[in-house]
Amino acid sequence: MQTSETGSDTGSTVTLQTSVASQAAVPTQVVQQVPVQQQVQQVQTVQQVQHVYPAQVQYVEGSDTVYTNGAIRTTTYPYTETQMYSQNTGGNYFDTQGSSAQVTTVVSSHSMVGTGGIQMGVTGGQLISSSGGTYLIGNSMENSGHSVTHTTRASPATIEMAIETLQKSDGLSTHRSSLLNSHLQWLLDNYETAEGVSLPRSTLYNHYLRHCQEHKLDPVNAASFGKLIRSIFMGLRTRRLGTRGNSKYHYYGIRVKPDSPLNRLQEDMQYMAMRQQPMQQKQRYKPMQKVDGVADGFTGSGQQTGTSVEQTVIAQSQHHQQFLDASRALPEFGEVEISSLPDGTTFEDIKSLQSLYREHCEAILDVVVNLQFSLIEKLWQTFWRYSPSTPTDGTTITESSNLSEIESRLPKAKLITLCKHESILKWMCNCDHGMYQALVEILIPDVLRPIPSALTQAIRNFAKSLEGWLSNAMNNIPQRMIQTKVAAVSAFAQTLRRYTSLNHLAQAARAVLQNTSQINQMLSDLNRVDFANVQEQASWVCQCDDNMVQRLETDFKMTLQQQSTLEQWAAWLDNVMMQALKPYEGRPSFPKAARQFLLKWSFYSSMVIRDLTLRSAASFGSFHLIRLLYDEYMFYLVEHRVAQATGETPIAVMGEFGDLNAVSPGNLDKDEGSEVESEMDEELDDSSEPQAKREKTELSQAFPVGCMQPVLETGVQPSLLNPIHSEHIVTSTQTIRQCSATGNTYTAV
């Protein structure tokens, strides 16, 4: 396959049709064997062509006229994907015309000289002659300036060649060789070549054994599997990573595809636990041990352990870092708006605080990008001058030089004084919201994109530890600053938990939406639902327009019938949200209206699920799964839409009710609530319901999930509450972050 440089004769483009194992893997031409004398003549003629591109094959017909450069009528065979032939050192190339086809002539193209005396410079090419024809396999030109540094993926023809190779070298039976095609296809479906990454050989083989076990296939041994890998992903290199006595062989240049189900295996959990140890950076903190009042650093086995961890997991970390968005940077922090300085401080102290906190946030972003979550606690301890009153083990983790530098720039006494000022509190809260939003977008850049289970679990464990780490590090800081900081980090942790759960639901629902039989069953069950009855029951609570509800029902069924992808469903949900909130755009009541929309959406979908349950729908499980996904994704959309409307970050929106004082009845925005209530009254007046029905006694107070027991007792009689919600009534809680994050409220009627 070669294109003439001059391009004087534009050849027709013909798609190369690859064959299955029993067919020839060459274009439909009459390929004849070429005598040795004619081979040399053809080699010299080919050398006059100035460009031989990497991994190209030129077919030379024995009966055709050999054209000189510029006179060749070129026919190209474009591949639909990267399917390339390249040299494999020490390997053989076989023609796939039949099992008896053997390579009869292999002529190296190193340092070949053309008829004009021009050095060809083809690196690593070979001229192969078999019973079916002559093939010129080249890698690159020396004067091209580009060397072949990437591994190449085999074409379907190479799959057949690999099967024949294994059959001849290992003496595989016909039955076993017929199974190799499925094994090789599985490799192509789940792995891909990439620079700078590697996988342990044992991990690949364990994936393969699991695949064989699930599909009841007979696996080949490890040695034969290694040949399979190299025959498909040609040019792979092997590296031994790890310390002496604890190293393992890795395939370098291959990784699991991002959308492969192998990413969801739990076997990498142990690796991710190790991954959270310090590595790939200079050690910012050294463990210090106090012995007779003298702090001596560990210089023995502790450093060796760190080195072992670093060398063992450095290659694996690159695989998980590809799912992050490391291009994100911290937003610009605003200036501190302060009218009067606290006693004992100067403007230079405020500037020092701004500079130190910026560096502190950049360090946090740095360790998150490298998945070194455990270092966050040490960063907080250093910035807030953590000093445990009673060390339990006689050991404290700190870095004296770093602390002394920070102390010289801003003494702790002045830091504590500044933390009491309201302007500093507000400024630091805004900085935290911007930083945490950037961290969320780094760790989970796309909530619908598949994420490995190991990375998901590591993020959830990280979120679970955040509040405890921060509270412990700020043990000597004023309480008002602690509340402000904890409220922001709580919103960050809750967002990480929600987004990882949403991502997990998305991957589970993706399989359902791609299953034709399940979609047909869902359509059949959905057509049996009495939507008129559902609307009649939901109208009293939701107050939704009948035409809009009917339109949503029709659109939902149509989208389901079209077997839309998950991304198309996401676009549909976004359009529904935009249409529902459009009347409230630009109004102060927009956030409240958005929360009301979430409640109505959840209530209406629960009514549909109830109808499916009562009818014992066969597809109830599928509907329940996508209902959970759509509710979570709608929450995600509303959260971002409210943030856009208010000019804040989603983290700031979620942190609005992070403080108990902020959600107390006395501190709620009464004006906003009154405006929404007046709008709801107008909707009630315009409705067609009888006046008597609308005048029924109502309890207008809604109680969040997990609200305080005393508030319930004073607000409404417990007997009026639905017993099914009693599990959400808890005694005094520290925060109601769960309530504000999920947006779930219940109205006692």
Swiss-Prot record:
Gene that produces this protein: RFX3
Region (Disordered): 663-699
Self-association and partners: Heterodimer; heterodimerizes with RFX1 and RFX2, and RFX6.
GO BP annotations, alphabetical order: cell maturation; cilium assembly; cilium-dependent cell motility; DNA-templated transcription; endocrine pancreas development; epithelial cilium movement involved in determination of left/right asymmetry; negative regulation of DNA-templated transcription; positive regulation of DNA-templated transcription
Location(s) in or outside the cell: Nucleus
Pfam families, per the entry: BCD_RFX, RFX1_trans_act, RFX_DNA_binding
Function (record text): Transcription factor required for ciliogenesis and islet cell differentiation during endocrine pancreas development. Essential for the differentiation of nodal monocilia and left-right asymmetry specification during embryogenesis. Required for the biogenesis of motile cilia by governing growth and beating efficiency of motile cells. Also required for ciliated ependymal cell differentiation. Regulates the expression of genes involved in ciliary assembly (DYNC2LI1, FOXJ1 and BBS4) and genes involved in ciliary motility (DNAH11, DNAH9 and DNAH5).
Record has Signal as a keyword: no
Source species of the chain: Homo sapiens
Taxonomy, superkingdom: Eukaryota
GO molecular function (one): transcription cis-regulatory region binding
Acidic residues: compositionally biased ranges: 674-688
Protein name: Transcription factor RFX3
Protease in keyword set: no
Listed InterPro entries: DNA-bd_RFX, RFX-like, RFX1_trans_act, WH-like_DNA-bd_sf, WH_DNA-bd_sf
Residues of the DNA-binding region: 183-258
Lineage: Eukaryota, Metazoa, Chordata, Craniata, Vertebrata
GO cellular component labels: chromatin; extracellular region; nucleus; transcription regulator complex
